[in-house]
Amino acid sequence: MHSLARGHVVVTGGAGLIGSAVIWALNVRGIDDILVVDRLDTSEKWKNLVPLRYRDYLDADEFENRILTRASSFANISTVFHLGACSSTTEADAAYLMRNNYEYTKHLAHWAVDHGIRFVYASSAATYGGLERDLRDDADLDTLRPLNMYAYSKHRFDLYARDHGLLSRIAGLKYFNVFGPNEHHKAEMRSLVDKAFHQIRETGAIQLFKSHRTEYKDGEQQRDFIYVKDAVEVTLHIAEHDANGLFNIGSGTAHTWLDLVRPIFRAMNVPERIEFIDMPATLRDKYQYCTCASIDRLRASGYDAPVTPLADAVDDYVRNYLIPDRRLDPAQAPAGVK
């Protein structure tokens, strides 16, 4: 079993949603010997770092340069959580995505494996492309067809890791629909919970896409939602148990958009008002009506903790973070829903 308390921990993308939540969970465990790696641009994601405890910060490009030219300067690093990437599914600059999401990950993975460092990286559920329902992390990677350049950049590294003998020595995590505190900087890429909260506060209502398939009623399109607090507990489990290969990080259950938004109204103590609008014609042929992670491999790795019920997770997020405008703070709450 790998000890996260032994040696330094590196978290790339450490100011982002999942990265900052990983640091929070480590802090709750009493671990703060952490190097945060990120690109603090003009967004407000730096605010996610304010309550957290960590040893040092490095710009992502400087970190890459050092591991390529002065790897010896990083003595005693035992664990790397590589969670930094451009995660915009609408990013059109393919060269940027391949450089940032593919080449960068290759450099980090080889460096970590060569130096005996535990390496856990973020793949993505987007790599499954247009597949629906029971999405399996043991599927033949050659059969997957990503639908956007972001997903392809992630899938390309999964293929590289497999073909170069890395995937049996590292862990790739296919995060599904992660939501929770510390995501507001993501703008249009943030979860519907965050978007709906602000929409309800401003207008008293939330808009959802109508269904354009007869087997699904409006609002009953389904997704596998997972609370960020659960996602990071799974992430730490994978790192500690030396479980290698690809793992789906989801709840294993599909819920409807209505299941997601109704608890928001209750937590805000406002009447439920849901309006259904036409889906843009450009999305209709690409829209997935049901995604659900198979988590058999995760359970086989020994992770047996229950997933926070969706309504409880939404309630915790809205009441304890969105309404008071708080971020994850190890001084205020232990890991888990409180």
Please identify what each model-predicted range represents:
Residues V9-R29:
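N-terminal Rossmann NAD(P)H-binding glycine-rich loop of SDR-like oxidoreductase domains
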Residues F81-G84, A94-Y102, K106, H110, ...:
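Catalytic Tyr-X3-Lys loop
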Residues P51, A60-N100, G129:
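NAD(P)H-binding glycine-rich loop region in Rossmannoid oxidoreductase-like domains
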Residues R99, E103-H107, D114, R118, ...:
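Catalytic helix-loop patch of NAD(P)-dependent Rossmann-fold dehydrogenases
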Residues I200-K338:
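C-terminal substrate-binding subdomain of Rossmann-fold SDR/epimerase-dehydratase oxidoreductases
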Residues L147, F176-R190, F197, K210-V228:
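Glycine-rich "substrate-gating" loop/helix at the edge of Rossmann-like oxidoreductase active sites
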Residues T12, V37, V80-G84, F119-A125, ...:
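SDR active-site strand-loop-helix element
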Residues L35-F63:
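Glycine-rich phosphate-binding loop and adjoining beta1-alpha1-beta2 segment
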